[in-house]
Amino acid sequence: MSDIPGDLKFLKSHEWVRIEDNNRAIVGISDHAQNLLGDLVYVELPNIGDHLDAGATAAVIESVKAASDIYSPVTGKVIEVNTTLSDKPETINEDPYGEGWIMVIEMQAPEEISDLLSPDDYTEVLESDEH
């Protein structure tokens, strides 16, 4: 398992969120998730301007093994999507916590962050899944 950046929060479904200034939340999937999925071949991105509720399906990623929904960790409006993924979905495999981000959400309820998992809590979820 790769190192999990300490500035992220997680959902049990393996999405991560990095909070920036101005209530901006960058969202992607964990290294663990991309490893489980294998080589990604397609990413269906949300539309800029879409309103997402926390826990709602925001995007879909497809690999040679399976398709998987990506859930929004927070409530808000999509203000940016990673268009690079349309041509190079494998960017998620190569750099899930960096260049492989999926979308940026302008949060409407920043307090939702407290409901998400810390890196340590997420690591515990992964370890309990392995047993």
Curated annotation (Swiss-Prot):
Family: Belongs to the GcvH family.
Cross-referenced InterPro entries: 2-oxoA_DH_lipoyl-BS, Biotin_lipoyl, GCV_H, GCV_H/Fam206, GCV_H_sub, Single_hybrid_motif
Any coiled-coil regions, as ranges: none
One GO cellular component term: cytosol
Annotated function: The glycine cleavage system catalyzes the degradation of glycine. The H protein shuttles the methylamine group of glycine from the P protein to the T protein.
Modified residues (N6-lipoyllysine): 65
Cofactor(s), names only, from the UniProt record: (R)-lipoate
Pfam families xrefs: GCV_H
Gene for this chain: gcvH
Start and end residues of each Lipoyl-binding domain: 24-106
Cofactor comment: Binds 1 lipoyl cofactor covalently.
PANTHER family the record matches: GLYCINE CLEAVAGE SYSTEM H PROTEIN, GLYCINE CLEAVAGE SYSTEM H PROTEIN-RELATED
Biological processes annotated in GO: glycine decarboxylation via glycine cleavage system
Subunit text: The glycine cleavage system is composed of four proteins: P, T, L and H.
Name of the protein this chain belongs to: Glycine cleavage system H protein
Organism: Xylella fastidiosa (strain M12)
Keywords: Lipoyl
